[in-house]
Amino acid sequence: IEVLVEVDVGAHRCGVLPGAPALELAGAIAGEPGLRFAGLHAYHGAAQHLRRPAERRAAIARAAELASETKSLIERAGIDCGTVTGAGTGTFALERDSGVYNELQPGSYVFMDADYGRNERDADETRFEQSLFVWTTVMSTPAPDRAIVDAGLKAFAVDSGMPLFSDAPGLELTKASDEHGVVRVAAGSAGPKLGDRLKLVPGHCDPTVNLYDWIVAVRNDQVEALWPVAARGALT
């Protein structure tokens, strides 16, 4: 069985410390007859949503440095370190260009979300379009400055903030309960009408997808496919 050693290169989540602790674990794996040390997992998740490009560059430069030093240490001990894997949607070009990583792991680029949309970007950075939306219907208009929609906490994740409305200027989703969302209508803006269908951009695409059994694939206002979310709830 091929095994990667996860190294903490700045995310402070899982992973052994770079350097000697990673070497010790790699050596233990290499010494087991049923295992083969395959390389390092050096993913810096926290860097993906650093807002300024300079912050992301600095974080990944340090991550790449730690990964490179650890790889060299392991190889000097006579253990092959064939893979260094990491990177995400917010930084993949930096890992790609580092000369250290030979496998990249971006995933959110397929859908994007409101939180990634808050990242500042350099002019030459790759930009991915938003493709994941949650449709919701206006179910009540109790006041000129307020509307209620039928999407709430059961329809989208809020760990990275409330969803944003797509193509609906002047509307802001300010609060969500299980099956209701409270919409604030900006002064001078035309409020939505009862029964209007509105399109939401989720704050965080990953846990939002996990709430659904199916993704409805639409092109030019026509449904082209239904994609099952096969891994929904597969948490063990």
Regions found by a protein language model. Give the residues of each.
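Active-site loop/helix belt of alpha/beta enzymes
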Residues: 2-4, 8-122
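Structural beta-strand/beta-sheet cores of well-ordered domains, especially the beta-sheet scaffolds
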Residues: 1, 33, 77, 82, ...
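Generic structural signal for well-ordered, non-membrane alpha-helical segments
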Residues: 22, 56, 60-67, 127, ...
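Active-site loop ensemble at the mouth of alpha/beta enzyme cores that anchors a bound cofactor
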Residues: 56-58, 91-169
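C-terminal accessory subdomain/extension
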Residues: 141-236
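Solvent-exposed alpha-helices and their adjacent loops that cap or buttress functional pockets
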Residues: 30-33, 76-78, 96-97, 130-131, ...
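Glycine-rich, flexible loop/turn motifs
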Residues: 12, 138, 223
